[in-house]
């Protein structure tokens, strides 16, 4: 029986929105279930550096550096040929022909955003590129603090872009501590982070299948 790869692109034009944080945590969650590869197409290589610091005995997704369109194209083709179940693409924060091509390959595009004025002001260009790809897509709220005024206002603002909010990662110390240590925030004993990451992974797959 053949296995169809689920290709999830994590994309935003704005740096600092938590794009790699979302990509790494989705890849970790799916790696617990099935073969998973994280294609690191961001020139900063944050996901690649994260894997280098990861404990050798920890269950991990395969992380493949993809410097440029041809490398990403080869890696994605190979992942599909080898029937890797989950393929997460961490895309660079800019617009280019490479981005358009990779977005078009996605089964689902997730757009991380923080509930801040700076993020929301710059999100239109990201959304325009996502809509142009004609792929399923939605927002992930990152570093979310529900008690803040901005958090209460973000729902109506994002609704104007005709994309659903798929899920949330909270503003937790565990996430900022985990990545520099080669870990996920949910691997540091934070039970709320554990629940949050697995819930997000399930919601992303539901969106992939049902949107």
Name the predicted role of every residue range.
Residues 2-17, 24-100, 179-187:
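P-loop/Walker-type NTP enzyme "switch/lid" segment
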Residues 175-198:
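Inter-lobe coupling/hinge region of RecA-like P-loop helicase motors
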Residues 108-111, 118-143, 149-162:
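Anionic-ligand binding region
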Residues 35-37, 86-87, 109, 136-138, ...:
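Hydrophobic anchor at the start of a short beta-strand
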Residues 145, 155-183:
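Beta-strand-loop-alpha "switch" segments that mediate conformational coupling across diverse proteins
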């Amino acid at each position: 029986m053949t296995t169809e790869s689920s290709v999830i692109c994590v994309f935003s034009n704005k740096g600092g929105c938590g794009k790699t944080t979302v990509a790494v945590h989705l890849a970790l969650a799916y790696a617990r279930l099935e073969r998973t590869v994280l294609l690191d197409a961001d020139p900063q290589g944050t996901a690649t550096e994260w894997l280098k610091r990861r404990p050798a005995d920890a269950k991990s997704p395969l992380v493949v550096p993809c410097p440029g369109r041809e490398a990403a194209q080869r890696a994605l083709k190979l992942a599909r040929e080898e029937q890797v179940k989950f393929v997460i693409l961490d895309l660079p924060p800019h617009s280019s022909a490479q981005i358009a091509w990779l977005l078009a390959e996605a089964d689902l595009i997730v757009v991380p955003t923080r509930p801040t004025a700076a993020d929301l002001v710059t999100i239109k260009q990201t959304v325009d590129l996502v809509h142009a790809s004609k792929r399923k897509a939605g927002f992930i709220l990152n570093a979310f603090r529900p008690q803040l005024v901005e958090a209460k206002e973000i729902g109506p603002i994002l609704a104007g872009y005709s994309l659903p909010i798929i899920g949330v990662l909270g503003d937790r110390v565990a996430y900022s501590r985990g990545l520099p240590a080669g870990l996920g925030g949910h691997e540091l004993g934070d039970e709320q982070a554990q629940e949050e990451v697995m819930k997000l992974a399930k919601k992303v797959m539901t969106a992939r299948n049902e949107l």
